[in-house]
Amino acid sequence: VLAEPMGRNTAPAIGLAAFILQRTNPEAVIGLFPSDHVIANPDRFREVLADGIQIAASGENIVVLGVHPTRPETGYGYIEAGSLASGDALRVRRFTEKPNAETAAEFLKAGNYYWNSGMFLWSARTLAGALTEHLPKTAAVLEKIAADYDTKKFPATFRRLYPKCENISIDYAVLEPRSAKGEEESNIFCLRADFGWNDLGSWTALHEHHATKQSPADGNLISGQGIFTLNASRNYVHA
Protein backbone atom coordinates (compact mmCIF):
# COMPACT_ATOMS: atom_id res chain seq x y z
CA VAL A 1 0.00 0.00 0.00
CA LEU A 2 1.32 3.41 -1.01
CA ALA A 3 -0.23 6.16 1.11
CA GLU A 4 -0.03 9.54 -0.61
CA PRO A 5 1.67 12.26 1.45
CA MET A 6 -1.05 14.57 0.12
CA GLY A 7 -4.03 14.18 -2.18
CA ARG A 8 -3.36 15.03 -5.83
CA ASN A 9 -6.42 13.35 -7.39
CA THR A 10 -6.41 10.09 -9.34
CA ALA A 11 -3.91 10.72 -12.16
CA PRO A 12 -0.77 10.96 -9.97
CA ALA A 13 -1.90 8.14 -7.67
CA ILE A 14 -2.56 5.55 -10.37
CA GLY A 15 0.31 6.95 -12.43
CA LEU A 16 2.85 6.27 -9.70
CA ALA A 17 1.70 2.65 -9.51
CA ALA A 18 2.19 2.38 -13.28
CA PHE A 19 5.71 3.80 -13.24
CA ILE A 20 6.72 1.54 -10.34
CA LEU A 21 5.31 -1.58 -12.01
CA GLN A 22 6.80 -0.64 -15.35
CA ARG A 23 10.29 -1.05 -13.91
CA THR A 24 9.80 -4.77 -13.25
CA ASN A 25 6.76 -5.86 -15.28
CA PRO A 26 5.69 -3.34 -17.94
CA GLU A 27 3.00 -5.65 -19.33
CA ALA A 28 1.27 -6.05 -15.95
CA VAL A 29 -2.40 -5.09 -16.19
CA ILE A 30 -3.54 -2.51 -13.65
CA GLY A 31 -7.14 -2.13 -12.49
CA LEU A 32 -8.59 1.06 -11.04
CA PHE A 33 -11.61 0.43 -8.79
CA PRO A 34 -13.24 3.12 -6.61
CA SER A 35 -14.07 1.91 -3.11
CA ASP A 36 -17.62 3.28 -2.75
CA HIS A 37 -19.28 1.05 -5.35
CA VAL A 38 -21.70 -1.84 -4.91
CA ILE A 39 -21.46 -4.88 -7.20
CA ALA A 40 -24.62 -7.00 -7.02
CA ASN A 41 -23.34 -9.85 -9.22
CA PRO A 42 -19.69 -10.61 -8.37
CA ASP A 43 -19.52 -13.60 -10.74
CA ARG A 44 -20.55 -11.49 -13.73
CA PHE A 45 -18.15 -8.77 -12.56
CA ARG A 46 -15.27 -11.25 -12.69
CA GLU A 47 -16.32 -12.36 -16.19
CA VAL A 48 -16.29 -8.78 -17.48
CA LEU A 49 -12.90 -8.18 -15.83
CA ALA A 50 -11.47 -11.28 -17.50
CA ASP A 51 -12.58 -9.96 -20.90
CA GLY A 52 -11.19 -6.53 -20.08
CA ILE A 53 -7.83 -7.89 -18.98
CA GLN A 54 -7.43 -9.67 -22.31
CA ILE A 55 -8.12 -6.44 -24.20
CA ALA A 56 -5.83 -4.36 -21.98
CA ALA A 57 -3.02 -6.89 -22.34
CA SER A 58 -3.09 -6.86 -26.15
CA GLY A 59 -1.60 -3.65 -27.48
CA GLU A 60 -1.77 -0.14 -26.05
CA ASN A 61 -5.42 -0.45 -25.11
CA ILE A 62 -7.42 1.22 -22.36
CA VAL A 63 -10.60 -0.43 -21.11
CA VAL A 64 -13.38 1.42 -19.27
CA LEU A 65 -16.43 -0.22 -17.73
CA GLY A 66 -19.57 1.66 -18.75
CA VAL A 67 -22.95 1.46 -17.01
CA HIS A 68 -26.22 1.69 -18.94
CA PRO A 69 -27.87 4.88 -17.60
CA THR A 70 -31.30 4.67 -15.99
CA ARG A 71 -31.87 8.40 -15.48
CA PRO A 72 -30.40 11.73 -16.68
CA GLU A 73 -27.82 11.80 -13.87
CA THR A 74 -25.67 14.96 -13.68
CA GLY A 75 -23.33 13.59 -11.02
CA TYR A 76 -21.58 11.06 -13.29
CA GLY A 77 -19.34 11.38 -16.31
CA TYR A 78 -20.55 9.90 -19.59
CA ILE A 79 -18.97 7.71 -22.28
CA GLU A 80 -20.12 8.04 -25.87
CA ALA A 81 -19.81 4.59 -27.44
CA GLY A 82 -19.04 4.16 -31.12
CA SER A 83 -18.73 1.08 -33.27
CA LEU A 84 -18.55 -2.50 -32.03
CA ALA A 85 -14.90 -3.59 -31.99
CA SER A 86 -14.99 -7.30 -31.18
CA GLY A 87 -16.98 -9.45 -28.81
CA ASP A 88 -18.77 -7.13 -26.40
CA ALA A 89 -16.22 -4.31 -26.64
CA LEU A 90 -17.34 -0.95 -28.01
CA ARG A 91 -14.96 1.71 -29.28
CA VAL A 92 -15.12 4.96 -27.33
CA ARG A 93 -15.77 8.23 -29.16
CA ARG A 94 -15.46 10.68 -26.29
CA PHE A 95 -15.81 11.30 -22.57
CA THR A 96 -17.98 14.05 -21.08
CA GLU A 97 -17.58 15.04 -17.44
CA LYS A 98 -20.76 15.62 -15.41
CA PRO A 99 -23.10 17.32 -17.92
CA ASN A 100 -25.96 19.65 -17.07
CA ALA A 101 -29.49 18.26 -16.81
CA GLU A 102 -30.46 19.11 -20.39
CA THR A 103 -27.37 17.44 -21.86
CA ALA A 104 -27.77 14.40 -19.60
CA ALA A 105 -31.34 13.99 -20.87
CA GLU A 106 -30.08 14.14 -24.47
CA PHE A 107 -27.46 11.48 -23.70
CA LEU A 108 -30.11 9.21 -22.17
CA LYS A 109 -32.34 9.62 -25.22
CA ALA A 110 -29.49 8.96 -27.69
CA GLY A 111 -29.02 5.41 -26.40
CA ASN A 112 -25.27 5.08 -27.06
CA TYR A 113 -24.05 6.78 -23.88
CA TYR A 114 -22.94 5.04 -20.71
CA TRP A 115 -22.15 6.27 -17.25
CA ASN A 116 -18.42 6.32 -16.60
CA SER A 117 -18.08 3.96 -13.64
CA GLY A 118 -14.52 5.09 -12.92
CA MET A 119 -13.29 1.51 -13.34
CA PHE A 120 -10.43 1.10 -15.83
CA LEU A 121 -7.94 -1.52 -17.03
CA TRP A 122 -4.61 -0.90 -18.77
CA SER A 123 -1.06 -2.19 -18.78
CA ALA A 124 1.59 -0.39 -16.77
CA ARG A 125 3.41 0.46 -20.00
CA THR A 126 0.27 1.86 -21.65
CA LEU A 127 -0.64 4.10 -18.73
CA ALA A 128 2.91 5.34 -18.18
CA GLY A 129 3.17 6.14 -21.88
CA ALA A 130 -0.18 7.95 -21.92
CA LEU A 131 0.81 10.10 -18.94
CA THR A 132 4.15 10.90 -20.56
CA GLU A 133 2.30 12.03 -23.69
CA HIS A 134 -0.55 13.98 -22.12
CA LEU A 135 0.83 15.04 -18.71
CA PRO A 136 4.61 15.18 -19.25
CA LYS A 137 5.61 17.30 -16.23
CA THR A 138 3.80 15.10 -13.74
CA ALA A 139 4.99 11.96 -15.52
CA ALA A 140 8.59 13.12 -15.13
CA VAL A 141 8.06 13.63 -11.39
CA LEU A 142 6.46 10.20 -11.01
CA GLU A 143 9.31 8.56 -12.89
CA LYS A 144 11.83 10.13 -10.48
CA ILE A 145 9.85 8.89 -7.49
CA ALA A 146 9.58 5.39 -8.96
CA ALA A 147 13.34 5.30 -9.55
CA ASP A 148 13.90 5.28 -5.77
CA TYR A 149 11.31 2.61 -5.06
CA ASP A 150 12.71 -0.31 -3.04
CA THR A 151 15.50 1.92 -1.71
CA LYS A 152 15.94 3.67 1.63
CA LYS A 153 15.57 7.00 -0.15
CA PHE A 154 12.02 6.29 -1.31
CA PRO A 155 10.01 7.70 1.64
CA ALA A 156 11.90 11.01 1.54
CA THR A 157 11.77 11.20 -2.26
CA PHE A 158 8.05 10.45 -2.20
CA ARG A 159 7.30 13.19 0.33
CA ARG A 160 9.53 15.74 -1.41
CA LEU A 161 8.48 15.25 -5.02
CA TYR A 162 4.86 14.10 -4.92
CA PRO A 163 3.48 17.59 -4.11
CA LYS A 164 4.97 18.75 -7.44
CA CYS A 165 2.44 16.58 -9.31
CA GLU A 166 -0.54 18.31 -10.89
CA ASN A 167 -3.83 17.94 -9.04
CA ILE A 168 -5.87 16.30 -11.80
CA SER A 169 -8.09 13.28 -12.39
CA ILE A 170 -7.16 10.47 -14.76
CA ASP A 171 -10.23 11.38 -16.81
CA TYR A 172 -9.02 14.90 -17.58
CA ALA A 173 -5.34 13.94 -17.77
CA VAL A 174 -5.53 10.95 -20.12
CA LEU A 175 -8.98 9.81 -21.18
CA GLU A 176 -10.37 13.04 -22.63
CA PRO A 177 -7.27 14.01 -24.65
CA ARG A 178 -6.73 10.45 -25.79
CA SER A 179 -10.34 10.04 -26.95
CA ALA A 180 -9.96 13.27 -28.95
CA LYS A 181 -7.78 11.29 -31.37
CA GLY A 182 -10.92 9.56 -32.64
CA GLU A 183 -12.40 6.16 -31.89
CA GLU A 184 -10.12 4.31 -34.34
CA GLU A 185 -6.90 5.89 -33.05
CA SER A 186 -7.47 6.23 -29.32
CA ASN A 187 -7.56 2.49 -28.54
CA ILE A 188 -10.09 3.07 -25.76
CA PHE A 189 -12.73 0.38 -25.40
CA CYS A 190 -15.91 0.21 -23.33
CA LEU A 191 -17.27 -2.98 -21.78
CA ARG A 192 -20.82 -2.91 -20.45
CA ALA A 193 -20.91 -3.11 -16.67
CA ASP A 194 -23.98 -5.34 -16.58
CA PHE A 195 -23.29 -6.74 -13.13
CA GLY A 196 -25.61 -4.68 -10.93
CA TRP A 197 -23.39 -1.63 -10.38
CA ASN A 198 -24.25 1.29 -8.15
CA ASP A 199 -22.21 4.21 -6.87
CA LEU A 200 -23.41 5.02 -3.37
CA GLY A 201 -22.51 8.68 -3.76
CA SER A 202 -26.02 10.12 -3.51
CA TRP A 203 -29.33 9.50 -1.75
CA THR A 204 -30.89 8.59 -5.10
CA ALA A 205 -28.26 5.90 -5.66
CA LEU A 206 -28.75 4.56 -2.13
CA HIS A 207 -32.52 4.44 -2.68
CA GLU A 208 -32.07 2.56 -5.97
CA HIS A 209 -29.70 0.08 -4.35
CA HIS A 210 -32.20 -0.91 -1.67
CA ALA A 211 -35.32 -0.78 -3.85
CA THR A 212 -36.85 -4.09 -4.98
CA LYS A 213 -39.82 -5.16 -7.08
CA GLN A 214 -41.68 -5.64 -3.79
CA SER A 215 -41.04 -2.06 -2.66
CA PRO A 216 -44.22 -0.14 -1.72
CA ALA A 217 -45.90 2.03 -4.32
CA ASP A 218 -45.16 5.22 -2.37
CA GLY A 219 -41.43 4.63 -2.84
CA ASN A 220 -40.66 4.72 0.88
CA LEU A 221 -37.86 2.34 1.88
CA ILE A 222 -37.82 1.58 5.58
CA SER A 223 -35.17 -0.30 7.53
CA GLY A 224 -35.97 -0.82 11.19
CA GLN A 225 -38.87 -1.55 13.53
CA GLY A 226 -41.76 0.65 14.62
CA ILE A 227 -41.43 3.17 11.77
CA PHE A 228 -44.58 4.65 10.22
CA THR A 229 -44.95 7.21 7.43
CA LEU A 230 -47.76 9.70 6.84
CA ASN A 231 -48.22 11.68 3.61
CA ALA A 232 -44.62 10.85 2.66
CA SER A 233 -43.15 9.36 -0.50
CA ARG A 234 -39.75 8.36 -1.91
CA ASN A 235 -37.96 8.45 1.44
CA TYR A 236 -35.22 6.22 2.78
CA VAL A 237 -35.57 5.67 6.52
CA HIS A 238 -33.03 3.69 8.53
CA ALA A 239 -33.30 3.43 12.29
Regions found by a protein language model. Give the residues of each.
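Short coil/turn connectors at secondary-structure junctions
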Residues: 25-28, 58-62, 74, 87-92, ...
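Flexible, glycine/proline-enriched loop segments at strand-loop-helix junctions
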Residues: 36-43, 89-95, 113-118, 160-161
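A conserved mid-domain beta-alpha-beta active-site/ligand-binding segment of alpha/beta enzyme cores
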Residues: 108, 113-121, 131
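Left-handed beta-helix
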Residues: 124-239
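Conserved hydrophobic/aromatic beta-strand scaffold that supports enzyme active sites
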Residues: 64, 78, 119-121, 236
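Conserved beta-loop-beta/alpha segment of the NTase-like Rossmann-fold superfamily
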Residues: 1-84, 129-135
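A short, charged helix-loop
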Residues: 81-114
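A residue-level structural signature of the nucleotidyltransferase/glycosyltransferase Rossmann-like core
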Residues: 30, 112, 119-120, 167, ...
